[in-house]
Amino acid sequence: MQKLKQQVFDANMDLPRYGLVTFTWGNVSAIDRERGLVVIKPSGVAYETMKVDDMVVVDMDGKVVEGGYRPSSDTATHLALYQRYPSLGGVVHTHSTHATAWAQAGMAIPALGTTHADYFFGDIPCTRALSEEEVQGEYELNTGKVIIETLGEVEPLHTPGIVVYQHGPFAWGKDAHDAVHNAVVMEEVAKMAWIARGINPALNPIDDYLMNKHFMRKHGPNAYYGQK
């Protein structure tokens, strides 16, 4: 597990590096599918003092199996996503400014241009509000459930992120590094959408044919973007 702990530590340290977190407002995890174990950031530990061995290992029920700290308070959300989507290898949650602003506004981040379409096949959805019962009950688990409910039958790696109503963004990927990459892109396209809508409030979404081209040339079966 040491290799995975290093990867998760590095991914967590990328959050302040890319300006996605203030104080301790974020967490990254990754899963070892063969062992059924998840490595995640400890709860409330400052990035400035955090070390590789501070990462916490939990089983799929959230029980700590390795580590001297409590795991992130969002652990149950991460576990719900891993259990539902076998293609996920890493999950990240932040309160990055622009993506969180869309969450607080209760609005999906609209697909307005090719930067968005290179990573997200359509709008980045916003969940419904959690009920009082859901919040007072198993809040973090119910956050995972409302993400799953909102995604429906969507392939999660085609829409590798979401904003939770009045809360903030979650992103995911094939591993922890990929999840952080998608979180960085989500914050950038959230900012771009806010600026673009300010310039032209009547702006239309990106044309489907242009969105399809940009997404499929990177992620489709005949993708040709980048090097082999």
From Swiss-Prot:
NCBIfam families registered for this protein in UniProt: PRK08193.1, PRK12348.1
Reactions catalysed: L-ribulose 5-phosphate = D-xylulose 5-phosphate
Keyword Zinc: yes
EC number, as in UniProt: 5.1.3.4
Recorded metabolic or biological pathway in which this protein acts: Cofactor degradation; L-ascorbate degradation; D-xylulose 5-phosphate from L-ascorbate: step 4/4
Pfam families: Aldolase_II (PF00596)
PANTHER family xrefs: FUCULOSE PHOSPHATE ALDOLASE, L-RIBULOSE-5-PHOSPHATE 4-EPIMERASE ULAF
Residues the record lists as binding substrate: G26, N27, S43, G44, S72, S73
GO molecular function per UniProt: aldehyde-lyase activity; L-ribulose-phosphate 4-epimerase activity; zinc ion binding
Domain of life where this protein originates: Bacteria
UniProt cofactor note: Binds 1 zinc ion per subunit.
Record's protein name: L-ribulose-5-phosphate 4-epimerase UlaF
GO biological process, one term: pentose catabolic process
Gene3D superfamilies named among the record's database cross-references: Class II aldolase/adducin N-terminal domain
CDD domains named among the record's database cross-references: Aldolase_II
Family, per entry: Belongs to the aldolase class II family. AraD/FucA subfamily.
Inducing or repressing factors: Induced by L-ascorbate. Repressed by UlaR.
Active-site residues, Swiss-Prot/TrEMBL: D118 (proton donor/acceptor), Y225 (proton donor/acceptor)
UniProt keyword Cell inner membrane present: no
Record: residues binding Zn(2+): D74, H93, H95, H167
Keywords assigned: Carbohydrate metabolism, Isomerase, Metal-binding, Zinc
Cofactor: Zn(2+)
GO CC annotation, single: cytosol
